[in-house]
């Protein structure tokens, strides 16, 4: 999905062909995109937040905002640490988490800016729903290659994915 000037759209419908990987399909779509005239974002789930895809979209002028798996490697303070392990360490003090509201839902969020495997500098948001703060199963993480975005902006842009995800789910069922 692409976000440009406040509008979020599914850019292309491509029938899945098992002879071509989903990653290659996304690569081909990215290479066909026109260069955006304003700040634009590739919105994606955790399958597409890795170096190769991020770099292809960056070359076309798009930042990436997407989900991350909680076993993704970060480098806080220069030390390699799994995202979920880093979140557990942060819970000891709890002081670095801030309560934010996105579309009437409240979340405790920690903002990390730094290195990930294959990505020199990005923002990663570690997020817990307000009522599940500290529950390892409730931990969600989001990446933004646009480090200038606020926590609220990043989560608000990412939340724009859900209507289209619901559409895809209904298409798969039918």
Whereabouts are the PLM-identified features?
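Single, function-defining residue in the core of a domain
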Residues: 4-174
């Amino acid at each position: 999905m692409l976000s440009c000037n406040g509008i979020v759209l599914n850019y292309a419908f491509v029938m899945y062909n098992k002879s071509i990987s989903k990653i290659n399909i996304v690569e081909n779509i990215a290479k066909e995109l026109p260069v955006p005239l304003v700040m634009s974002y590739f919105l994606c789930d955790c399958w597409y937040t890795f170096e190769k895809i991020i770099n292809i979209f960056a070359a076309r002028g798009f930042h990436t905002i997407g989900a991350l798996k909680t076993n993704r490697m970060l480098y806080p303070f220069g030390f390699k640490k799994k995202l979920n392990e880093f979140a557990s360490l942060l819970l000891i003090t709890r002081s670095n988490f801030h309560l934010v509201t996105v579309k009437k839902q409240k979340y405790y969020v920690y903002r990390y800016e730094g290195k990930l495997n294959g990505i020199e500098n990005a923002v990663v948001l570690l997020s817990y729903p307000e009522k599940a703060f500290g529950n390892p199963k409730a931990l969600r993480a989001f990446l933004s290659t646009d480090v200038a975005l606020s926590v609220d902006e990043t989560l608000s842009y990412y939340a724009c994915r859900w209507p289209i995800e619901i559409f895809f789910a209904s298409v798969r069922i039918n």
